[in-house]
């Protein structure tokens, strides 16, 4: 692997960033007695990619070099999975919330699922618009079951490439079909969400200026290999392993050299998810 510098997606890693290696209409739910989500709707669904690269001077945050590689890789990957991909670049906090509100009010009744990818600086529980922080729960809350009715019972995937703190991982060496009958069923409003974070709580998330972030590189690679073979959680487990074992930071600053990363999956899915039918 070529040694180009890596950066982190933290809210305020100003100087080292460049030094380091380098609701909707009537409910048409996906609920059924089956153990896997119904994915044979006319459309796979929307994939919204928010790619924040440049930030207002007042934030003190450096540009996220390499993020355009991630955005292009994601667009190709999810287009091949038959999603309708919409790329949005350099959105403010207000624009992010306006976009999520607008998308949640679309009619998703003919769509099997929903995907949103957030590429930005971050910290625990927040993502950064170009002008400051926004609470992740506000971003995702528009798609709760009590707000976005036409996605109730359907998988809602949020993929988040951003730091979740300022800790560094030094690593350690080792040796080693019946929908109508379910239409009135009450389910938790937070059900059927999945959050795929690029890193564990509290930690930096690494990004390479040439190849993009470790997490998005790995996610796209595993989806290309296994999206038509494996259940989604199994794919994410392979993503975890790839990031954990195949990447290590290269930095001119010894404090940031030789560091590791492990993605984190938070699932409230209630069924198995196969991105094909």
From Swiss-Prot:
GO terms for cellular component: cytoplasm; death-inducing signaling complex. Cleavage by granzyme B, caspase-6, caspase-8 and caspase-10 generates the two active subunits. Additional processing of the propeptides is likely due to the autocatalytic activity of the activated protease. Active heterodimers between the small subunit of caspase-7 protease and the large subunit of caspase-3 also occur and vice versa. Pfam families: Peptidase_C14 (PF00656). It is found in: Cytoplasm. The active site is at 121, 163. One of its GO terms (biological process) is erythrocyte differentiation. The modification S-nitrosocysteine is found at residue 163. The keyword Glycosyltransferase does not apply. GO terms for molecular function: cysteine-type endopeptidase activity; endopeptidase activity; enzyme activator activity. This is Caspase-3.
